[in-house]
UniProtKB/Swiss-Prot annotation:
PANTHER family: CELL DIVISION PROTEIN KINASE, CYCLIN-DEPENDENT KINASE 8-RELATED. This is Serine/threonine-protein kinase ssn3. Keywords: Activator, ATP-binding, Kinase, Magnesium, Metal-binding, Nucleotide-binding, Nucleus, Repressor, Serine/threonine-protein kinase, Transcription, Transcription regulation, Transferase. The gene is ssn3. Residues 389-398 have a biased composition (Basic and acidic residues). InterPro entries: CDK, Kinase-like_dom_sf, Prot_kinase_dom, Ser/Thr_kinase_AS. Coiled coil: none annotated. It comes from the Eukaryota. It catalyses: L-seryl-[protein] + ATP = O-phospho-L-seryl-[protein] + ADP + H(+); L-threonyl-[protein] + ATP = O-phospho-L-threonyl-[protein] + ADP + H(+); [DNA-directed RNA polymerase] + ATP = phospho-[DNA-directed RNA polymerase] + ADP + H(+). It is found in: Nucleus. Its EC number is 2.7.11.22, 2.7.11.23.
Length: 426
């Protein structure tokens, strides 16, 4: 039974209406408004190829804390070329202006000032990468099983909302899963998100590289030109595993594109998956023979000695070792991931995207049905405290910050990540 703290999802896949939506539909562009007139800039959070992110508080009676994402115009050398915004920036603004769900980051407004775009979001104090990192210091101690369950449920709840509205996220990873101080999960950074309802061209033709390498689904690694919301569910499986083990389950090295922008076969990442999940074959993934990189997979299998490549899945032993080393009970009981947790993980990490569990099916899984109510506050019952985001005050001039343009190069955008967390990830 699901807790009453979750009024958003019902058993038939719909969403209960709320008396007070978090904002009016169509929140969007605000003209003739200056950022500093509405917001006091507290300090600098992080930066990337898109621009910079600052923490702010509202002025003139507008309460609350905000994260202001400043997009920079494209630059060529020292000359700024006002050539418009990147596709990713336009998508993020368009989608965030329409989406409204408790488990998706909330956009307050968009401001245009001096040919710069500012996206004003609600402020979130934590993200999953910070939380995972906290549990590795000074020595490893597990994230409580009840917290993992709440995090995963809220994440899937937000993902169901996105998929129901024909939105693929395409960059789910711990750094992009935000957590408020009250323990609410928000899916953030929709810079790579896009609508997938009747696309005019294949999704591959628009963005040849999607999803950070450690969380990239096997169909993407195998060069699939057409993919589905299943790519987001694989990433959720990777995040679930990382919450339990406190380290990425498939930590491969990314092969970079050559000068001709040819997407290479990610051999090392595929091997990391095979080491745990076994070699994919027609029995567990019938469509694999039609994948563009299938010959590369065959070559990879033949290049390794027969006893040096796993033909069957080792996920079960990985999971048991994870529970044992993490201090969880290996038996299925209240407060531990147990057998239900393994079944959900294995269905999220199904090689075949056509049989991989959906967000709706996952929310109805026994892992959530059994074990009592799920709190909408993932910190409920947790006696420890997580450190706040690192905010620097020596670089808080939102008007003068100078960085590259809005265009992404690969997948660098950990927009609300602290500097320390970025260094840890690298």
């Amino acid at each position: 039974m699901l807790g009453r703290n979750f009024p958003y999802f019902n058993s038939v896949g719909g969403f209960y209406s709320r008396e007070n939506s978090r904002r009016q539909p169509g929140t969007g562009y605000t003209s003739k408004v200056r950022v500093r007139d509405k917001y006091h800039i507290v300090g600098f959070i992080s930066s990337g190829t898109y621009g910079r992110v600052y923490k702010a508080v509202g002025r003139n009676g507008q309460g609350g804390e905000f994260a202001i994402k400043k997009f920079k115009p494209d630059k060529e050398g020292d000359i700024i070329q006002y050539t418009g915004l990147s596709q990713s920036a336009i998508r993020e603004m368009a989608l965030c202006s329409e989406l409204d769900h408790a488990n998706v980051v909330q956009l307050a407004e968009i401001i245009l000032e001096d040919k710069c775009i500012f996206m004003v979001f609600e402020y979130t104090e934590h993200d999953l990468l910070q939380i995972i990192h906290h549990h590795t210091q000074p020595q490893r101690h597990p994230i409580p099983a009840a917290m993992v369950r709440s995090i995963l449920f809220q994440l899937l709840n937000g993902l169901l909302y996105l998929h129901t509205n024909w939105v693929l996220h395409r960059d789910l990873k711990p750094a992009n899963i935000l957590v408020t101080s009250s323990g609410a999960i928000r899916i953030g950074d929709l810079g790579l998100a896009r609508l997938f309802y009747k696309p005019l061209n294949s999704l591959f033709s628009g963005d040849k590289v999607v999803v950070t390498i450690w969380y990239r689904a096997p169909e993407l690694l195998m060069g699939s030109r057409h993919y589905t919301p299943a790519v987001d569910l694989w990433a959720v499986g990777c995040i679930f595993a990382e919450l339990l083990s406190l380290r990425p389950i498939f930590k491969g090295e990314e092969a970079k594109m050559d000068s001709k922008k040819t997407v290479p076969f990610q051999r090392n990442q595929m091997m990391k998956i095979i080491d745990i999940m076994g070699l994919p074959h027609r029995d567990n993934w019938p469509g694999i023979v039609h994948m563009p990189e299938y010959s590369q997979l065959q070559s990879l299998a033949m290049s390794r000695a027969p006893n040096h490549i796993s033909r069957t899945s080792n996920l079960g032993s990985w999971y048991q070792n994870c529970l044992k080393n993490g201090g969880y009970s290996v038996n299925s009981s209240v407060g531990t991931p147990g057998d239900d947790g393994f079944d959900l993980l294995s269905r999220l990490l199904d090689y075949d995207p056509t049989s991989r569990i959906t967000a709706k099916e996952a929310l109805e899984h026994p892992y959530f049905k059994n074990g009592g109510p799920i709190s909408a506050n993932c910190f409920e019952g947790f006696e420890g405290k997580y450190p706040h985001r690192r905010i620097t005050h020596d670089d808080n001039d939102i008007r003068s910050g100078s960085l590259p343009g809005t265009k992404r190069s690969g997948l660098p955008d950990d927009s609300l990540m602290s500097r320390a967390a970025k260094r840890m990830k690298e």
